[in-house]
Curated annotation (Swiss-Prot):
Source organism of this protein record: Cuscuta gronovii (Common dodder)
Keyword field: Membrane, Photosynthesis, Photosystem I, Plastid, Transmembrane, Transmembrane helix
Compartments where located: Plastid membrane
Gene3D superfamilies in alphabetical order: Single helix bin
Gene that this sequence comes from: psaJ
Keyword Repressor: no
Protein name: Photosystem I reaction center subunit IX
């Protein structure tokens, strides 16, 4: 039961950090390439 409580306390922290990183990445990409439907380095 203690391990389950540890899991419940770690999962929100990891999800918050990963979502914070993702939002920061998207904000910076929109700052450097505003209104881009496709990014230049993703084109093949």
């Amino acid at each position: 039961m203690r391990d389950f409580k540890t899991y419940l306390s770690v999962a929100p922290v990891l999800s918050t950090l990963s979502l914070g990183f993702l939002t920061g990445f998207l904000i910076e990409m929109n700052r450097f390439f505003p209104d881009a439907l496709t990014f230049p380095f993703f084109s093949f």
